[in-house]
From Swiss-Prot:
Gene3D superfamilies: 6.10.250.2190. This is Islet amyloid polypeptide. Residues 24-35, 78-93 form a propeptide. InterPro entries: Calcitonin-like (IPR021117), Calcitonin/adrenomedullin (IPR021116), Calcitonin_CS (IPR018360), Calcitonin_peptide-like (IPR001693), IAPP (IPR000443). GO terms for cellular component: cytosol; extracellular space; neuronal cell body. Residues 1-23 form the signal peptide. The gene is Iapp. Amylin/IAPP is a glucoregulatory peptide hormone that plays an important role in the regulation of energy homeostasis. Selectively inhibits insulin-stimulated glucose utilization and glycogen deposition in muscle, while not affecting adipocyte glucose metabolism. IAPP function is mediated by the CALCR-RAMPs (AMYRs) receptor complexes. Amylin can also bind CALCR receptor in the absence of RAMPs, although it is more selective for AMYRs. Residues 83-93 have a biased composition (Basic and acidic residues). It comes from the Eukaryota. Belongs to the calcitonin family. It comes from Mus musculus. It is found in: Secreted.
Amino acid sequence: MMCISKLPAVLLILSVALNHLRATPVRSGSNPQMDKRKCNTATCATQRLANFLVRSSNNLGPVLPPTNVGSNTYGKRNAAGDPNRESLDFLLV
């Protein structure tokens, strides 16, 4: 029982420690696409930890289902596809 009460404090300390980390640098000039994809390790880890804490804590309210924010979710545009000609019919009038 005592171990469970110390868990939030340990996770908070871990969050602060991860917040000060930096991602290992990629060689400059190697690949511009890789430079765009670089992730700040501290930011990613902190966000994952925050999501874990929100979903695992019963004291803070209801446990919310994970949000669907992927690239194939409703409302996203298909950037690779051609524009739909039927949707452009109103321009011809």
